[in-house]
Amino acid sequence: QVRPATLRDAKAIAQIHTIAAQAVYKGLVPDDQLKTLSVEKRQAYWREAIEYCEPQVQVAVEDEKIVGFVGFDRSRDEKSRPTTGEIWAIYAAPTHWSKGVGLALWDAARDGLQEEGCTNVTAWVPLRNERALRFHEMAGFKREMSTAKTAVVGGVKIEEVRLKRPIN
C-alpha cells in the first residue's frame, strides 16, 4: 500500500533514507563519510518537505510499517519545461529491495505527476549506482548521457546522469 506521508512518518522516512543510502553508497563514498549521515538531519528535512509539500512525499507501508518512500515534484533543472516532473528521491528499506516496493512507489509518483500536468519525468542517478540505474531503466527511464555532471555528496564528488521517460 502506498499513501501520502504525514508528519509522523518523517522519522521512519529519515531512517530508511539513511540506512539505504549507507548501503547504496558503500564503496562509492568513504566509510567515514557514510557514518556521518544523520537520521536527525534527514528527519528535519523530510518533516519540512511533508509539511510544505515540496517535494510531495508518498510512503510504502507493509503491516503498518513504512518500508519505502518517494519524493517527487516539478523538475529542479533550470532549463526544464513546466510539464517535466522529477523523482527527487526514491528509496526502499534494504530488507525490501527487489520486492516491488520501488515499483509501487514509482507508480504513485507517476500518478501524482500526471495529476500535476506533467508529461515527462526525470531522475538524477549516480553513474556507479548500478542498482538504481537498473531500477529506473526497468521502469522505462532512458539515460541522457549528455547530461552527466559531478555532484558533491557528503563532501565526495560523484558522477551523476539524468534519466528521463514520458509519464504515459
What are these regions (language model features)?
Residues 113-124:
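Conserved GNAT acetyl-CoA-binding A-motif
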Residues 13:
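Hydrophobic pocket/interface hotspot
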Residues 17, 64, 136, 141:
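Conserved active-site tyrosine of GNAT-family acetyltransferases
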Residues 2, 87, 158-160:
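Hydrophobic residues on conserved beta-strands that form the core of alpha/beta folds
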Residues 4-7, 18-28, 32-95, 103-108, ...:
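Acetyl-CoA-dependent GNAT
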Residues 157-168:
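Terminal substrate-recognition subdomain of acyl/acetyltransferases
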Residues 74, 122-126, 137, 142-159:
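Conserved catalytic-core motifs of GNAT/GCN5-like acyltransferases
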Residues 100:
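Glycine-rich phosphate-binding loop
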